Amino acid sequence: LEEHVAVGYNDGEVEIFAFPSLEKRCSPEKRCDDEAISCAKYSPSGRVLAIGSHDNAIYLMDASANYRVKKKLHGHSSYVKNIDWSFDSDLLQTSCGAYEIMYWSVAEGKRYRGAQDSVESDTRWQDWSLTLGFPVMGINADGSDGTDVNAVCRSRDEGLVIVADDSGH
């Protein structure tokens, strides 16, 4: 697949651009509702784009079929804040504005109902953008309520974590 960049807008629209030329490739026919897009991430295989929305849902788009929405995942009680893919592109982990972490089976298009402990300990994630979870324990300052950290990115070799917080650190 050609490399693409996905851009989500406040009105729920998504546009796809070629990279690095930034030529517009397409706008998927179906909007992700009318709510703001809060995050987007391609699967490691590059075949699926996961979009997180302020309608509390995750949209799975088929990158090889003009970004047609394949599945819509429901379950969060607030807007979807972060999305991470497993290395094998089989699972998603997501978090939301209510600080819920959920796991999803991409093939089934459903919330993963297996043993949560085994997913957390046995799954290798392509990267880590959730502001919650074992790999990022200790990123919040003492006495923090957890809302100070706005963004996290763990390197693929799992050796570094970059954190952006309200204090500019």
Where are these regions (language model features)?
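WD40-repeat beta-propeller superdomains and closely related acidic/aromatic-rich repeat-like regions
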Residues: 1-169
